[in-house]
Curated annotation (Swiss-Prot):
InterPro entries (UniProt xref): DHS-like_NAD/FAD-binding_dom (IPR029035), ETF_a/b_N (IPR014730), ETF_a/FixB (IPR001308), ETF_alpha_N (IPR033947), ETF_asu_C (IPR014731), ETF_asu_C_CS (IPR018206), Rossmann-like_a/b/a_fold (IPR014729)
GO molecular function terms listed in the Swiss-Prot or TrEMBL record: electron transfer activity; flavin adenine dinucleotide binding; oxidoreductase activity
CDD domains listed in its UniProt record: ETF_alpha
The protein's name in its UniProt record: Electron transfer flavoprotein subunit alpha, mitochondrial
Location in or out of the cell: Mitochondrion matrix
Protein keywords: Acetylation, Electron transport, FAD, Flavoprotein, Mitochondrion, Phosphoprotein, Transit peptide, Transport
Organism: Rattus norvegicus
Region feature Domain I, mapped onto this chain: 20-204
Length: 333
């Protein structure tokens, strides 16, 4: 289990660094590596010791080659089988357990994405350990920092488990360099198929806009837009900025946009170079998902809106006038 750590305990563990070894579970789409995996590798490197990556899937040779070049990775373990199609946690867990049994890793981690949040609790349960979720900082090999109360407080936890299983908030760690490494690759330990689930199909929505969690610019709308049709104002602005479009929980709950656009504690965590909040009041739940953005611009007609407390630039005005004006100015450039 884990408990709150006393300040004096944070100084220990320097002598343990040489004994650390970490397994990063790579998230990928067979031909491309998920960006959050690079952030997770950086976090794993903070623990000291050797960092290995496990790649499971089908026809994922390109991902293996890319990971071998990533700085900080010592070894890439590869498991290619039809059972790993779709990266189902029911199938990946036995593989991870066999890998852990053979190599005795002290830490197992993945990005705190839907993939990692779905997989790691199952792995931890099978190992009979308590996982630590969504960490934002590593104090020492057994001490981690995560947010609580919708990001309003930080909790430092000391994990005494024999194997530390944790997920990493990608926005809190820089991405590892995609070149400069020279890791070796080898076949991962074999494991039997669980046989309790089967991957059938996946249909991805195609968009010319960047993916929300990886975009450098994000334009988000809230309940102030009043309808889903009015989100076209944001789409037009986003097209000029080559930006992704997000939304507050209030906008999603109102049915303006689908829930995969939600930014916030119960949605997606983003940290773009530029975040433009349009018609968003700034509820705690939303701020928890975007407050790490490099530059925040808020547009709201209410000067007392909480969003202005975290914004670098604020525009107190009617969004239905300001947003079209911004779009027209950008079109002329």
């Amino acid at each position: 289990m884990f408990r709150a750590a006393a300040p004096g305990q944070l100084r220990r563990a320097a002598s343990l660094l040489r004994f650390q070894s970490t397994l990063v579970i790579a998230e990928h789409a067979n031909d491309s590596l998920a960006p959050i995996t690079l952030n997770t590798i950086t976090a794993a490197g903070r623990l000291g010791g050797e960092v290995s990556c496990l790649v499971a899937g089908t026809k994922c040779d390109k991902v293996v080659q890319d990971l071998c070049k990533v700085a900080g990775v010592a070894k890439v373990l590869v498991a290619q089988h039809d059972a790993y199609k779709g990266l189902l946690p029911e199938e990946l867990t036995p593989l991870i357990l066999e890998t852990q049994k053979q190599f005795s890793y002290t830490h197992i981690c993945a990005g705190a994405s839907a993939f990692g949040k779905n997989l790691l609790p199952r792995v931890a349960a099978k190992l009979n350990v308590a996982p630590v979720s969504d960490i934002i900082e590593i104090k020492s090999p057994d001490t981690f920092v995560r947010t609580i109360y919708a990001g309003n407080a930080l909790c430092t936890v000391k994990c005494d488990e024999k194997v530390k299983v944790f997920s990493v908030r990608g926005t809190s760690f820089e991405a590892a360099a995609a070149s400069g490494g020279s890791a070796s690759s080898e076949k991962a330990p074999s494991s039997s198929s669980a046989g309790i689930s089967e991957w059938l199909d996946q249909k991805l929505t195609k968009s010319d806009r960047p993916e929300l969690t990886g975009a450098k610019v994000v334009v988000s709308g809230g309940r102030g837009l009043k309808s889903g049709e009015n989100f076209k104002l944001l789409y037009d602005l986003a097209d000029q900025l080559h930006a992704a479009v997000g939304a507050s929980r209030a906008a999603v709950d109102a049915g303006f946009v689908p829930n995969d656009m939600q930014v916030g504690q119960t949605g997606k965590i983003v940290a773009p170079e530029l975040y433009i909040a349009v018609g968003i009041s700034g509820a705690i739940q939303h701020l928890a998902g975007m407050k790490d953005s490099k530059t925040i611009v808020a547009i709201n007609k209410d000067p007392e809106a909480p969003i202005f407390q975290v914004a670098d630039y604020g525009i107190v005005a009617d969004l239905f006038k300001v947003v079209p004006e911004m779009t027209e100015i950008l079109k002329k450039k």
